[in-house]
C-alpha cells in the first residue's frame, strides 16, 4: 500500500520587489523567495533513495499556490555513458561512472496543461518551469536557511553585456516549396504527431572552458548534465529523446585550434570527430562547448540538415552565459539546424523569441515555432536520417522500470505514464486485460487498427504507409503483410 510521506517545511514567500541579489545565474532585480514544501509517495517501510523517481513540491508564485510534479529523467544517460579527461603527460583517462541515481528531473505544473519543467535536484531545486505562458527560473539561495530558493523571470536577470548574441548560420534551403507542401497535407491529429526519434549526444568541453571553471571537473560535469537535461526537455514536444553518451573534457590542451570564426572551428571539430571521437564510441551528434568569443557576436554555429553525417553532424557553442538554461537553448538551437531547421522568419512565424530565433532575447522561449516544426517534419520526410531511427536497446538506458519516461524498458509492455491510461496499467507497466497496444500510429482505443488502414500519407514518390493489423507501429514505405 502506498502511503504519502509529507515533509513539512514552513511554506513562506518573501517578495523582495525592487531589491537586487546576486545569484549563480547573475544579478537579479525582481524575485521571490520561496520555501518549497515537498510531498513524496513511498511504499510503507521503504528506504527512501537519495533521489526519488517521482517528487512533488508546493510553493507560491506571485501569491498563487503552485504544485510542481517531477519525474526522474530516466533516459538521460546511456548505459555505457563515459567521461574522458587527460593527464599532464597526455594519457587519456576514461571512466564509466554510475549515473543511475542521478538528480535530473522533468515535469509539469498541476492544473496547467501547457506547463513544463526541467529541474536539477542535486543541491536544492535549480532549473526552469513554464507557468501560465511565462518561463521562470528557480535556484537555491546561499542563506543560513538552506531551504530558501529564489524564483524569477529570465528578463529580470541583468544582461552580462549589451551586445546582441546571435547564431552564425546564414545558409538557407534552395527552396521552401517542400515546407509549404508538407504543412498543407491533410493529416489527422494522430498522424501529425512526430515519429519517435532518439539522439545519442556527445559533448566535448575545450580547454578554455575547463580553466574558466577553475579546472574543476565536477563543476563541468554538473553544468553539462544540467544543460543536457534542459535540451532533453525542450526536444520532448518533437518526440525526440536525448541520451548523453559521452563527455570528453580537454583538460590539458585543445585537440583542434579553436578559432574566432565559428564555421572554421566547426569544420575542424567535425574533422576531429570523424577521425577520433567516433572511434571512441558510437553517437549521433556532437557539440563542442568553448569559452572562445566568436567573431560578429556569434554564440553558436552548426551545419544545416546534416544529422547523422560523420563529419557534419556537429555544432559549436560558446558558453556565453552563467545561466545554464540560456546556453542549453543555444545548444538546442544548433541541434535544430542539424535537424533541418532554419532561423525563424519574424514576419512569418508567430513566435517572437522561440528556440530558432536568430538573436537571443530577454524573453527567451523554450519552444520551437510552427515554422521550425514544419522544417523538421520536411527534413524527416525528405532525408529520413537513419542514425536516429533506432531506440536505445532496453539495456542501454540506465534505469529501473518507471512509468511515463518515454522509453520502453526491460520488463515493460507499455510506457504507461498516468494511472488513468486506459490501455496500460501504471503499477506494472503491462497492458491491461483485453488491450493490444497503448500507443502508436496503428493503435486506436487500445486495439490494433485494421489491416491496410492508412497511418502515414504519401510524400513525394513514397506510397501511403498502412497498418499491418498486427502491430501498433506504422511501417515505412507501404510494407504490410
UniProtKB/Swiss-Prot annotation:
Subcellular location: Secreted
Position of the signal peptide: 1-20
Disulfide bonds: 308-387, 349-371, 351-354, 414-429, 416-424, 423-446, 437-443, 442-467, 455-474
Alphabetic keyword roster: Cell adhesion impairing toxin, Disulfide bond, Hemostasis impairing toxin, Hydrolase, Metal-binding, Metalloprotease, Platelet aggregation inhibiting toxin, Protease, Secreted, Signal, Toxin, Zinc, Zymogen
Transmembrane stretches, start-end: none
MF terms in GO: metal ion binding; metalloendopeptidase activity; toxin activity
Pfam family, one: Disintegrin
Domain Disintegrin: from-to ranges: 400-481
GO cellular component terms attached to this protein's record: extracellular region; plasma membrane
GO biological process annotation, one example: proteolysis
The keyword Secreted is assigned to this record: yes
Tissue spec: Expressed by the venom gland.
Keyword match Metal-binding: yes
EC category name: hydrolase
Principal subcellular localization: secreted
Peptidase M12B domain sequence ranges: 197-392
Subunit structure: Monomer.
Note in the entry: The sequence shown is that of elegantin-1a.
Name the UniProt record assigns to this protein: Zinc metalloproteinase/disintegrin
Amino acid at each position: 500500500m502506498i502511503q504519502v510521506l509529507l515533509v513539512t517545511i514552513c511554506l513562506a514567500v518573501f517578495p523582495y520587489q525592487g531589491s537586487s541579489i546576486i545569484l549563480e545565474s547573475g544579478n537579479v532585480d525582481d524575485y521571490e523567495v520561496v520555501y518549497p514544501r515537498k510531498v513524496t509517495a513511498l511504499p510503507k517501510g521503504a528506504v527512501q533513495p537519495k533521489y526519488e523517481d517521482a517528487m512533488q513540491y508546493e510553493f507560491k508564485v506571485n501569491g498563487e499556490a503552485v504544485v510542481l510534479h517531477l519525474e526522474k529523467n530516466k533516459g538521460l544517460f546511456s548505459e555505457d555513458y563515459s567521461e574522458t579527461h587527460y593527464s599532464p603527460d597526455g594519457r587519456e583517462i576514461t571512466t564509466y561512472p554510475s549515473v543511475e541515481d542521478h538528480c535530473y528531473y522533468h515535469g509539469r505544473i498541476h492544473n496547467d496543461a501547457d506547463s513544463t519543467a526541467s529541474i536539477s535536484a542535486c543541491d536544492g531545486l535549480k532549473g526552469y518551469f513554464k507557468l501560465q505562458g511565462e518561463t521562470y527560473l528557480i535556484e537555491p539561495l546561499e542563506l543560513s536557511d538552506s531551504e530558501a530558493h529564489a524564483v524569477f523571470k529570465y528578463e529580470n536577470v541583468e544582461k552580462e553585456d549589451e551586445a546582441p548574441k546571435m547564431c552564425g548560420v546564414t545558409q538557407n534551403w534552395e527552396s521552401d516549396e517542400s515546407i509549404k507542401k508538407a504543412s498543407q497535407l491533410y493529416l489527422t491529429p494522430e498522424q501529425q504527431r512526430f515519429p519517435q526519434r532518439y539522439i545519442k549526444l556527445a559533448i566535448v568541453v575545450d580547454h578554455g572552458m575547463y580553466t574558466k571553471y577553475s579546472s574543476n571537473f565536477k563543476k563541468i560535469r554538473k553544468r553539462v548534465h544540467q544543460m543536457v537535461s534542459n535540451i532533453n526537455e525542450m526536444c520532448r514536444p518533437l518526440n525526440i529523446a536525448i541520451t548523453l553518451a559521452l563527455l570528453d573534457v580537454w583538460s590539458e590542451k585543445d585537440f583542434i585550434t579553436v578559432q574566432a570564426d565559428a564555421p572554421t572551428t566547426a569544420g575542424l571539430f567535425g574533422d576531429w570527430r570523424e577521425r577520433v571521437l567516433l572511434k571512441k564510441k558510437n553517437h549521433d551528434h556532437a557539440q563542442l562547448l568553448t569559452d572562445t568569443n566568436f567573431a560578429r557576436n556569434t554564440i553558436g554555429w552548426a551545419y544545416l540538415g546534416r544529422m547523422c553525417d560523420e563529419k557534419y553532424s556537429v555544432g559549436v557553442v560558446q558558453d556565453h552565459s552563467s545561466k545554464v538554461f540560456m546556453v542549453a537553448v543555444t545548444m538546442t538551437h544548433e541541434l535544430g539546424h542539424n535537424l533541418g531547421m532554419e532561423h525563424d522568419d519574424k514576419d512569418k512565424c508567430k513566435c517572437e523569441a522561440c528556440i530558432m530565433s536568430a538573436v537571443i532575447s530577454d524573453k527567451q522561449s523554450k519552444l520551437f515555432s510552427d515554422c521550425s516544426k514544419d522544417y523538421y517534419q520536411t527534413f524527416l520526410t525528405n532525408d529520413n536520417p537513419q542514425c536516429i531511427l533506432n531506440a536505445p536497446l532496453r539495456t542501454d538506458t540506465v534505469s529501473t522500470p518507471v512509468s511515463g519516461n518515454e522509453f520502453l524498458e526491460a520488463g515493460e509492455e507499455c510506457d504507461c505514464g498516468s494511472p488513468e491510461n486506459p490501455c496500460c496499467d501504471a503499477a506494472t507497466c503491462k497492458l491491461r486485460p483485453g488491450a493490444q497496444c497503448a500507443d502508436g500510429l496503428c493503435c486506436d482505443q487500445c486495439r490494433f487498427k485494421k489491416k491496410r488502414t492508412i497511418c502515414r500519407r504519401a510524400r513525394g514518390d513514397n506510397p501511403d504507409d498502412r497498418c499491418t493489423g498486427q502491430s501498433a507501429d506504422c511501417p515505412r514505405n507501404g510494407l504490410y503483410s
